């Protein structure tokens, strides 16, 4: 029997964990920012990769852009390519001026999409490094708050069921997080200490990424070694016993070899939530060979260890006489209330090693091979609260009876009675799960691709092709409580449950959760193999008009087994699924100038139900193994304009996204299931980013959505209703201004707004979370060219907002908090 775990206590912060740094960006050639806040950058034309990176302090930034193209145009007869670049020589150098805040001039970050965001025919939101630095971003979740259409169901500081879980344009993207173009299979909360910038590719993108990407894909571009030496250390401290240190060292070893090391130590409580904390550390060394050469290779290792308390927030309740449920905190219950037990914990250890090879074989052909192996370990135990009014004899009531939570069956009515203190909340979600588990995964992926640029007569081509092989396996061992997990007070909860014992699943087999089609099982094993082939051709009929068409073929083969427990009552089960999919895309681009593009894009994506091997405890059941995959189609027309010598980037996109056989995620277990729902989200997305005036940076986005359930395939959906978690309106804005740059009394002041309209929490549109409004601010000062101090303030008016959203509960966001930061850069 596993011993009862003591209450988790905050460890004192170790000075060793604070040795540390936010990084100088990766760059092949560095350039120094001018007094206007713009940056000179060297552009190298020849190879089909684009790398844009920035590093800045208080509005002063360094940017380096390497944009590479080539063709076979003879010397003396040079013609501008689709990007407006003369490419009659393979290594032409041109100097341009760009703002490090201009998202359009950032790379997407993967070889299969070799152009920058400006020249990619799809709406792409890029969170540049200078923005993350000014906001003191510490996690992927915090970075993505700058992107419209992103909703977190689990995120940094809020904890939750399965690490980072995001929705893009209202659709699940839990398996659509990539790092340098390779899928990150891990289930953990991602720290941002090794980030250069983050790209969000909106809309179905299976032609590039393979299965998944219904709403889009998130691609993290990490810091990479570069020529030249750079050293930076950073320390933050503030509200919530917050202590954080980061380190970034880049060392040039030879004229073509460089080494880089980034590290992080972080300990914090969550302001505005009781007992929630995160203790984590990470390290990411990398070495690059062949910098500036025709053949280069980058080897990277990443490790992150995280011990945190998961937070399932507060329950939704229904006031008598009102049909719409709201978070219980909207009726005066304290936002700090946490309904977990001393057993709750989320401990993860994640390791990845990545190799990226680039070979410029000839002026017209470049080959890439990217490979990654990952090992992920996790122990997870959480309490999921529910406050309901249940009728005796129902399944929900009986589950409460089994788990000793009978008082919670009348929690809702008790709360609105004359004696609200009598309300008791269940800690098992009212449906008995999920049980604690230990998870071990490993994965491997290899993507080989080539980019060829050539002419057939007077028509130019850019052909991208290759193959993608990925394999992932997951093993879970469940645990069971030997006694009842009793309910607790809704108004004054306690984490202590006297006599509660957690044991091995074989010790208490009858205490396991009974999953339909699976039973009460002890061990769960799953694996999946995906083999994909992709090919596309962009054809320039004139210097300004081009058409790109492509497809990807995938074969997805997965298996799932549930074994152990009381096999006499619940026999072992074994399921499998084999899906072959073809996903096309077609784009039309009109580029009258290198800084202006108007485009149309049509693309499709496919998501097999068995795809979520590491993200779900039951990736397959008897019902879902034969279910058709989810299909999505995107129609998008947009324009991108980089104005005033690339100082300001502006985008506008109109889109319609249709999805059939919608996948739904169980709010308690995280298991996925198919319905015959058909959904449509259509709308408008706008963005502007860059340097508006000398020393004045701005980053703003807006989204207008019309998310509709066009066909309800089950009684839990409302035909004509609004898709859950998707607001009609959403906007973000951040601005900063540098006063008296390079003067002893210099100062940078900044601030921002995050606004999201209220959203429905379920497909039936019976529960709703109110609008989110958050005001943040920043002030910084530079002592010289090396030292900087800053103060960041978050949620200045201490508004009760909700970050992570579920169908029957929500997690309050952080309260008002302040972080002091000091950094040194040499």
Name each model-derived stretch.
Residues 360, 366-372, 376-378, 382, ...:
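Membrane-embedded beta-barrel scaffold of Gram-negative outer-membrane proteins
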Residues 754-762, 768, 780-826:
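C-terminal beta-signal and adjacent terminal beta-strands/loops
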Residues 55, 65, 85, 89-228, ...:
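Acidic, small-polar-rich N-terminal luminal/periplasmic segments of exported/outer-membrane proteins
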Residues 193-196, 207-285, 291-295, 351, ...:
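Outer-membrane beta-barrel translocator/receptor signature
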């Amino acid at each position: 029997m596993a011993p009862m775990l003591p209450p988790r206590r905050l460890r004192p912060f170790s000075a060793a964990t604070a040795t540390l740094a936010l990084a100088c960006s990766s760059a092949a050639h560095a350039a120094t920012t001018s007094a206007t806040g713009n940056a000179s950058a060297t552009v190298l034309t020849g190879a089909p990769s684009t790398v844009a990176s920035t590093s800045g302090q208080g509005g002063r930034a360094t940017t380096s852009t390497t944009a590479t193209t080539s063709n076979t145009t003879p010397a003396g007869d040079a013609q501008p390519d689709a990007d407006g670049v003369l490419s009659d020589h393979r290594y032409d150098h041109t100097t341009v001026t760009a703002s490090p805040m201009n998202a359009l001039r950032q790379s997407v970050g993967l070889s299969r999409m070799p152009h920058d965001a400006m020249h990619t025919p799809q709406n792409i939101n890029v969170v540049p490094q200078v923005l993350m630095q000014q906001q003191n971003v510490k996690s992927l979740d915090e970075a993505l708050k700058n992107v419209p259409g992103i909703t977190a169901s689990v995120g940094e500081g809020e904890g939750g069921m399965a690490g980072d879980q995001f929705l893009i344009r209202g659709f699940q993207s839990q398996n659509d997080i990539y790092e340098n173009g390779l899928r990150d299979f891990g289930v953990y909360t991602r720290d941002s200490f090794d980030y250069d910038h983050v790209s969000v590719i909106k809309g179905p993108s299976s032609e590039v990424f393979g299965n998944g990407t219904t709403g889009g894909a998130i691609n993290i571009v990490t810091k990479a070694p570069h020529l030249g030496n750079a050293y930076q250390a950073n320390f933050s401290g503030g509200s919530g016993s917050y202590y954080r240190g980061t380190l970034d060292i880049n060392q040039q070893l030879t004229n073509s070899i460089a080494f880089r090391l980034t590290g992080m130590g972080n300990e914090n409580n969550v302001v505005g939530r009781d007992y929630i904390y995160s203790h984590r550390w990470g390290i990411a060394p990398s070495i690059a060979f062949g910098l500036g050469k025709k053949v280069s290779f980058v080897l990277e290792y990443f490790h992150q260890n995280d011990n945190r308390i998961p937070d399932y927030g507060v329950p939704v309740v229904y006031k008598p006489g009102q049909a719409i449920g709201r978070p219980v905190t909207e009726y005066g219950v304290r936002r700090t209330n946490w309904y977990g037990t001393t057993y709750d914990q989320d401990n993860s250890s994640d390791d990845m090693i990545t190799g990226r090879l680039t070979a410029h074989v000839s002026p017209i052909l470049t080959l890439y091979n990217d490979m990654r192996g990952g090992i992920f370990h996790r122990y997870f135990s959480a309490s999921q609260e529910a406050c309901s009014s249940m009728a005796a004899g129902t399944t929900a009531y009986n589950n409460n009876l089994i788990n000793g939570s009978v008082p919670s069956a009348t929690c809702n009515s008790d709360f609105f009675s004359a004696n609200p203190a009598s309300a008791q909340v269940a800690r098992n979600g009212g449906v008995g799960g999920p049980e604690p588990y230990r998870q071990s995964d490993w994965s491997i992926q290899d993507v080989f691709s080539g980019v060829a640029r050539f002419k057939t007569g007077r028509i130019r081509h850019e052909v991208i092709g290759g193959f993608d092989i990925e394999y992932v396996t997951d093993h879970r061992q469940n645990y069971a409580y030997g006694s009842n997990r009793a309910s607790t007070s809704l108004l004054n909860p306690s984490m202590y449950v006297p006599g509660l014992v957690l044991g091995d699943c074989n010790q208490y087999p009858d205490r396991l959760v009974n999953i339909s089609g699976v039973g009460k099982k002890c061990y769960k094993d799953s694996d999946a193999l995906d083999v994909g082939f992709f090919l596309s051709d962009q054809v320039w009929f004139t210097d300004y008009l081009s058409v790109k068409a492509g497809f990807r073929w995938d074969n997805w083969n997965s298996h799932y087994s549930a074994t152990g427990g009381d096999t006499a009552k619940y026999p072992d089960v074994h399921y499998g699924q084999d899906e072959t999919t073809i996903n096309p895309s077609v784009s039309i681009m009109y580029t009258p100038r290198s800084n202006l593009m108007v485009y149309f894009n049509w693309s499709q994506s496919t998501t097999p139900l068995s795809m979520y091997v590491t993200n779900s405890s039951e990736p397959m059941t008897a019902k879902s193994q034969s279910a058709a995959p989810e299909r999505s189609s995107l129609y998008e027309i947009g324009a991108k304009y980089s104005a005033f010598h690339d100082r300001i980037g502006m985008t506008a996109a109109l889109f319609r996204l249709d999805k059939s056989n919608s996948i739904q995620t169980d709010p308690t277990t995280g298991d996925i299931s198919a319905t015959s729902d058909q959904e449509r989200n259509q709308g408008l997305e706008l963005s502007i980013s860059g340097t508006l005036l000398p020393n004045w940076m701005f980053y703003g986005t807006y989204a207008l959505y019309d998310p509709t359930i066009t066909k309800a395939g089950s009684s839990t959906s409302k035909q004509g209703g609004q898709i859950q978690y998707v607001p009609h309106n959403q906007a973000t804005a951040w601005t900063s201004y540098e006063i008296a740059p390079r003067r002893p009394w210099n100062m940078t002041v900044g601030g921002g707004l995050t606004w999201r309209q209220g959203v429905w929490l379920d497909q039936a549109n019976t529960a709703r979370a109110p609008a989110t409004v958050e005001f943040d601010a920043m002030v910084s000062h530079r002592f010289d060219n090396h030292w900087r101090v800053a103060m960041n303030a978050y949620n200045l008016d201490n508004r009760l907002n909700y970050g992570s959203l579920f169908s029957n509960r929500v997690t309050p966001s952080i309260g008002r908090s302040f972080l002091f930061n000091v950094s040194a850069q040499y």
